[in-house]
Amino acid sequence: EKALPMMMTAAGTISPSKVFVVGVGVAGLQAIATAKRLGARVEAFDTRPVVEDQVKSLGARFVKIDLGDTEETNQGYAKALTEEQIQKQQEGMKKICASSDIVITTAQVFGRPAPKIITSEMVEAMQPGSVIVDMAVSSGGNVEGSKNGEIVEIHVVKIIGNENLPGEVPTHS
């Protein structure tokens, strides 16, 4: 319902869409790169501060939220956060989600259910017509209310829960 790039028209200037990516693994990095190529203004967050340079190298802004001590496994995966850290993360992301046109969540913890990061309260604060893509829906989802294989509309925000997005473009996947 909204164009991604900034456009100058005879009727005026259309500002670029704002995209917020949560989780900067392989899927998150691809989401950042794609949104930037399409002309969006992109911000990204991950509990692993070591990915900041990767986010910046793609032209996005890395969102810093002080969660205290966060770690990653030897394989580079994020470790589970405490309840207190999750609350801090949600508080830090609340304003960013509210001002974003698109939120893409990819956060998963190896061997565990995906953390619920986007609360229904955060969804309610988003602008009408905003879209959330929950790419972690197959392991429980990052968004309250997301359902696997469905597009759910909550408070005029569309939440897309699709565990097999590559299957939507089989020729290229």
Language model features: what each stretch is:
Residues 38, 57, 97-99, 126-128, ...:
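Short gly/pro-enriched beta-turn/loop segments at secondary-structure junctions
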Residues 47-49, 67-68, 108-109, 136-140, ...:
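Short, ordered loop/turn segments at secondary-structure junctions
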Residues 73-103, 107-121, 162:
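A structured beta-alpha segment of the ubiquitous adenosine-cofactor-binding alpha/beta core
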